[in-house]
Regions:
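C-terminal substrate-binding/catalytic lobe of Rossmann-fold NAD(P)-dependent dehydrogenases
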Residues: 26, 767-770, 774, 803, ...
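Conserved cytosolic headpiece of P-type ATPases
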Residues: 1-736, 742-745, 811, 828-899
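Alpha-helical transmembrane segments and their immediate juxtamembrane interface regions
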Residues: 784-804, 812, 816, 887-894
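Membrane-interface segments at transmembrane helix junctions and kinks
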Residues: 795-805, 873-882
Length: 899
């Protein structure tokens, strides 16, 4: 049956149609059978690209275009070996890109599985939490505020239920839902008007409901739309975009240098075909072939590593932003605290008692009524080892059981027939129950629980010795004093009240029943994390809905705030204009009793102050501030809406995990920065070695095949090793956060690139000229006159054997010096003797492979023929190794001078 018909059927007709039960749901066996028959409740994955499509995508790069042009020109000039090598390199580069992107894609797909939403389903009359993907048609689903609707559902029960359906209708105003609504059978009604239906991917913003699943997966309304949508472009990170722009710039510069050199050759009356080959070589030298692959694999591996420390990254750009975070705004409950609430104190009509001393003292009418209210006005459930619901409500159930009162029994005695769910504006929750009498029901009673300062405002009476008596001003003052006392002890407070009100009468004129104080101990590791943040230049700010005294007590214990003046309440915040708030914001460390709108204001105020803000949250009302923050951090136990709005999810709800994530973010950025500086300084050295030699009228020190070999073998492998290097976390977290717009070449990066580029240029030229200079010296023809010296070199390098050997020297030195250079680049602040090589086994492997292949290219006959190299003696290898080690010696000298 089409999903669009169910809004025209009453509840029983829908239940019969889907062979389900509106109270008990399906049996586990029937649910399993339907899952096997109809498949999982998931959107079909986008059609995967073919291997050919993936390969061609790798060629869509300006840097690759240069290599392809170089290959074509080489063919026209008769240099077939160079053309074959360039073509081979392009193919290998594309294949490596496909493999690495495949690895990145698999990592992200694994993360998607980790972030798949859960849902509450009722099967065989038992509420249980299952992955939304396992829902089947006919399942009875429980819907609460903050949940993402997991399938298309015909409502069977609704209580103040509102659903935001912008994902389907484009209308952002939540729609009031009504399970009893019945559409006119004679007319087709628009989706937005089907108020007895809720649809997959929409969001419950308010209230509570239950319903029968009518469609899953691609059969849902959103599934039909998804089947018509073409594949979306994959999101690129800001760093990837910047590196893409850098690639385009390098392409332009490369062509400019080639054109300049060609014009110079014409001016010098050089051989035109020969100079075309040189220009091709220069173009190749300017292309850092390994750069895109390094960045892709570095980010993907980082995301995979974060899973091991209980962090799920939902958006790749977040990895970069993490490293720049300067303020962490954290909720208190469950993040800075353990979220293991226990009732420690309770108060009823002037009796304040430790909960531990209340064991078995449920005989007092006041205690019974207060507990009855807190257990009935409660949506949590205890089912053996499975605890489902809000930690506050679970703590009340635990306390009730300790006192000999059980919610399930009370629910049978006082069945709930309506409710007003908790929301952040009212700060209360009310449920309406039938009163039992002589086997029947007489009248009704309403129980309300919420923040004591809010509840007391709605009360006119107080329960005294089992009777409801008018509340005096003195009693109101006493309640306020009890709340302050509990808050000063870092206890969360919750009050209960009762009334004879019906759902249409509001929540006024209630009778105050009592207060409980619950302790949520601070996480021991949170204090250490706050201190690490302080040393790292990252401020910690607590934002909570709790009372200011409770919040300050925890903040002081954790080292977030040292003085009461660093705290502000939502009410005080309302009285501050933007200018006053901007002046105070740097000193405020605790925000208490704040609304969702105020959270957004706090985030934006910090951002206007130049801060990069990470914000934690777990509720539906946290979604706006999570979206507003630079990094939205949702809790693993949070609602689906918060997770969808967040950039990052903490699966252990632990504040200390944020510190590990920021450390990882800083480390990833530093690794990419090291790789970029290494690759560009190496390519600059190759480019300038050739440019200077040719500008002097000499032959080219390197062939294009030599440069490609260096760039792919002795550049790309070490660059990849640098990209996955294990950083010193303690050192990283002793530095202030970088600015979000900071260039990769900031903090000495440009100087480092130019210094090592110049050094590699000198080494390359020295290696190229050492043989002809030696011959000139042996003849006694080494002249201090530059023109005579250049003329002598030019004459010697015109001889094929001398040129081949000189090019072999330059090729070998430039290839090996990249390996030495990479070892030093692991940590620009530390001596290589202070680094532990086995912390980066990939670097060890890259160096071993690099040296072995560089040796092979001058010793294996097939490779000698392909690359036009010469066999080297042991003495020559020793000399060239000394020259190649200069970048490492320079690194040690720089480190020594800094100290």
């Amino acid at each position: 049956m089409e999903a669009a018909v169910f809004e025209k059927q009453n509840i029983q007709e829908t239940v019969n149609e889907l062979k389900s039960d509106a109270v008990k749901g399906l049996t586990d066996g029937e649910a399993f059978r339907r899952l096997q028959q109809n498949g999982r409740n998931e959107m079909k994955a986008a059609r995967k690209k073919t291997k050919i499509q993936l390969f061609l995508e790798q060629l869509k790069d300006p840097l690759i275009y240069i290599l392809l042009i170089a290959a074509v020109v080489s063919v026209f000039l008769g240099e077939l070996s160079d053309a074959v090598i360039i073509g081979t390199v392009v193919v290998v580069n594309a294949l490596v890109g496909i493999l690495q992107e495949g690895k990145a894609r698999k990592a992200l797909e694994a993360l998607k599985k980790l972030t798949s939403p859960q849902t509450i389903v009722i099967r065989e009359g038992i509420r249980q939490e299952i992955p939304a993907a396992e829902l089947v048609t006919g399942d009875l689903v429980d819907l609460e505020a903050g949940a993402q609707v997991p399938a298309d559902i015909r409502l069977t029960r609704s209580s103040n239920l509102q659903v935001e359906e912008s994902a389907l209708t484009g209308e952002s105003v939540p729609v009031e839902k009504d399970a009893l609504f019945l559409a006119d059978c004679r007319h087709e009604i628009p989706l937005a008007e089907r108020v007895n239906m809720v649809y997959m991917s929409t969001v419950v913003t308010h209230g509570h409901g239950e319903g029968i699943v009518t469609a899953t997966g691609m059969a849902t309304e959103i599934g039909r739309i998804a089947s018509m949508i073409t594949d979306a472009e994959e999101e690129m990170t800001p760093l990837q975009k910047r590196l893409g722009d850098m690639g385009k710039l390098l392409s332009i510069l490369s062509l400019g240098v080639c054109a300049a050199l060609f014009l110079l050759a014409v001016f010098q009356h050089r051989n035109i075909p020969e100079m075309l080959l040189v220009a091709i070589s220069l173009a190749v030298a300017a292309v850092p072939e390994g750069l895109p692959a390094v960045v892709t694999i570095c980010l993907a591996l980082s995301v995979t590593r974060m899973v091991k420390v209980h962090t799920i990254i939902r958006r790749l750009p977040s990895v970069e932003t993490l490293g720049a975070v300067s303020v962490v705004c954290s909720d208190k409950t469950g993040t800075l605290t353990q979220n293991r609430l226990t009732v420690e104190k309770c108060w009823w009509y002037d009796v304040l008692e430790d909960a531990a001393g209340s064991n078995g003292r449920g005989e007092s009418r006041c205690v019974q009524e207060m507990l009855r209210g807190m257990l009935l006005c409660n949506d949590a459930s205890l089912q053996g080892e499975q605890r489902i619901g809000d930690p506050t409500e679970l703590a009340l159930l635990d306390f009730g059981e300790k006192m000999g009162m059980h919610r399930e029994r009370l629910e049978k005695q006082y069945p709930r027939y309506d409710e007003k769910p908790f929301d952040s504006d009212r700060k209360m929750m009310t449920t309406y129950h039938r009163i039992p009498k002589n086997g029947g029901h007489k009248g009704s009673i309403a129980y309300t629980k919420g923040a004591p300062d809010v509840i007391v405002q709605h009360c006119t009476h107080i329960l005294q010795d089992g009777r409801s008596v008018p509340m005096t001003a003195g009693q109101r003052k006493r309640i306020s004093e009890v709340v302050e006392l509990m808050n000063s002890l870092a206890l969360r407070t919750l009050a209960a009240a009762q009334s004879g009100n019906t759902p249409g009468c509001g929540e006024e004129g209630m009778t105050f029943l009592g207060i409980v104080g619950m302790r949520d101990p601070a996480r021991p590791e949170a204090e250490e994390a706050v201190e690490i943040f302080r040393r790292a230049g990252v401020s910690t700010v607590m934002i909570t809905g709790d009372h200011v005294d409770t919040a300050y007590a925890i903040a002081r214990q954790l080292g977030i705030a040292g003085h009461r003046s660093q705290c502000i309440t939502g009410e005080e915040l309302n009285h501050l204009d933007d200018a006053s708030f901007a002046r105070r914001i740097r000193n405020i460390r605790v925000y208490a009793r704040v609304t969702p709108a105020q959270k957004v204001r706090i985030v934006k105020g910090l951002q206007q102050n130049g801060e990069i803000v990470a914000m934690t949250g777990d509720g539906v009302n946290d979604a706006p501030s999570l979206k507003a923050a630079d990094i939205g951090v949702a809790m693993g136990t949070g609602v689906d809406v918060a997770k969808q709005a967040a950039d990052m999810i903490l699966t252990d709800d632990n504040f200390a995990t944020i510190e590990k994530a920021i450390e990882e973010g800083r480390g990833v950025y530093e690794n990419i920065r090291k790789s970029v500086i290494f690759l560009l300084s190496s390519n600059l050295g190759e480019l300038m070695t050739m440019f200077v030699a040719v500008a002097l009228g000499l032959a080219s020190p390197l062939k294009s095949s030599h440069i490609l070999w260096i760039n792919l073998i002795t550049d790309s492998l070490p660059a990849l090793a640098l990209g996955v290097d294990k950083n010193d976390g303690k050192s990283l977290m002793r530095c202030p956060p970088r600015k979000a717009a900071e260039s990769l070449f900031a903090r000495g990066g440009m100087a480092c690139t130019l210094l090592y580029g110049a050094l590699i240029t000198g080494i390359g030229l020295a290696a190229f000229l050492v043989l002809p200079c030696g011959i000139l010296a042996g003849r006694g023809e080494l002249s201090w006159n530059l023109s005579d010296w250049v003329e002598g070199l030019r004459e010697l390098l015109s001889r094929e054997k001398i040129l081949a050997r000189s090019q072999t020297y330059a090729f070998t030195v430039l290839g090996m010096c990249q390996l030495y250079h990479a070892v030093g680049m692991r940590d620009m602040q530390k001596s290589v003797f202070a680094m532990r090589p086995w912390d980066n086994p990939l670097m060890v492997l890259a160096c071993v492979i690099g040296f072995a292949l560089q040796f092979a290219v001058t010793e294996v006959p097939f490779l000698i023929g392909a690359f036009g190299t010469s066999h080297l003696s042991g003495q020559e290898w020793l000399l060239l190794n000394v020259l190649a080690a200069f970048p490492l010696l320079a690194h040690e000298l720089v480190v020594m001078l800094r100290k």
